[in-house]
């Protein structure tokens, strides 16, 4: 990890109005940057290196943590895209406090109408975004359009029987939206029902025929590469410090990892690294 934030930097970030009103206002800021470094920036090294002429795009950047982590830890040029202009401005201010705002090209836009030229990014990241766009095939194709070499995607897996990102009710996300809403309300989970529409591995890959899966466990090159990220701070609601996965989860992950590139079909997260076919 690069030097910890100073007290002044942390206070300045938490004082940014858009960030200070959000659900992530109390996250561990150092831990958050470290999370994105260890879970996304460093694992890319198993597939490719980055030089100062390479462009990494962070699609749906939110408060910019992934873009900031790439700016802090690689020489690459970064493009950060978000459809919420106010949130993007907050991300730019966070990056400014950390001294890397000049390393990042901030653009307002959305999947399906991305403000990038064809193949402008060597690597495009889309982390926990496509579940919020419906099942827009054009939006996923747009991701393939802007990436000249690689795509890294994470999103809940439609095939998995429970989605923690949603209501967490078994099989509920397989139901039509009206029935999902009724079930969520009946179980006291209506506040977590956001009408997200999830993608299956088959449907996602069908929209990106020019790309093939190269990761063997989630978006990592191996199950071991995932394990060495622990212990780790997880900056999501309900996250916090994780020493390791639980026993049953660890056993399941170990078994599924034996499927190699096909493991994404059985994982709760449809996370994968894709490379353009030669």
Give the label of every model feature segment:
Residues 1-118, 127, 140, 265-277:
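Conserved N-terminal segment of class I S-adenosyl-L-methionine
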Residues 68, 134-138, 163:
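Short N-terminal helix/helix-N-cap motif within the alpha/beta-hydrolase-1
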Residues 123-134:
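A short SAM/SAH-binding and catalytic strip from SAM-dependent methyltransferases
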Residues 137-151:
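A short glycine-rich, Lys/Arg-flanked "PGG" loop and its adjoining helix->strand segment in the class I
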Residues 152-179:
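Conserved class I S-adenosyl-L-methionine
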Residues 193-212:
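Short alpha-helix
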Residues 212-222:
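Conserved S-adenosyl-L-methionine
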Residues 244-271:
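Conserved Class I S-adenosyl-L-methionine
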């Amino acid at each position: 990890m690069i030097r910890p934030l100073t007290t002044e930097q942390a206070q300045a970030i938490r004082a940014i109005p858009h960030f200070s009103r959000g659900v992530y206002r109390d996250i561990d800021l150092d831990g958050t940057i470290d999370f994105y470094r260890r879970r996304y920036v460093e694992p890319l090294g198993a597939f490719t290196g980055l030089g100062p002429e390479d462009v990494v795009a962070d699609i749906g950047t939110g408060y910019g943590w992934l873009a900031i982590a790439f700016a802090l830890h690689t020489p690459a040029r970064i493009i950060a895209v978000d459809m919420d202009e106010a949130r993007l401005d907050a991300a730019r201010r966070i990056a400014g406090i950390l001294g890397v705002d000049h390393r990042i090209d901030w653009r307002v836009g959305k999947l399906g109408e991305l403000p990038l030229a064809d193949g402008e990014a060597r690597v495009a990241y889309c982390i926990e975004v496509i579940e919020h766009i419906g099942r827009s095939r054009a939006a996923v194709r747009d991701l393939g359009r802007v990436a000249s070499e690689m795509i890294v995607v994470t999103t809940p897996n439609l095939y998995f029987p429970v989605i923690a990102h949603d209501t967490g009710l078994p099989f509920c996300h397989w139901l039509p939206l009206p029935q999902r809403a009724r079930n969520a309300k009946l179980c006291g989970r209506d506040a977590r029902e956001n009408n997200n529409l999830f993608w299956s591995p088959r449907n996602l890959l069908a929209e990106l025929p020019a790309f093939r899966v190269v990761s063997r466990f989630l978006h990592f090159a191996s199950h071991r590469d995932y394990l060495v990220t622990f212990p780790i701070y997880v900056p999501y609601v309900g996250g916090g410090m994780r020493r390791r996965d639980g026993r049953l989860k660890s056993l399941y992950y170990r078994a599924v990892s034996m499927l190699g590139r096909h493991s994404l079909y059985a994982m709760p997260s449809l996370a994968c690294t894709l490379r353009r076919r030669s």
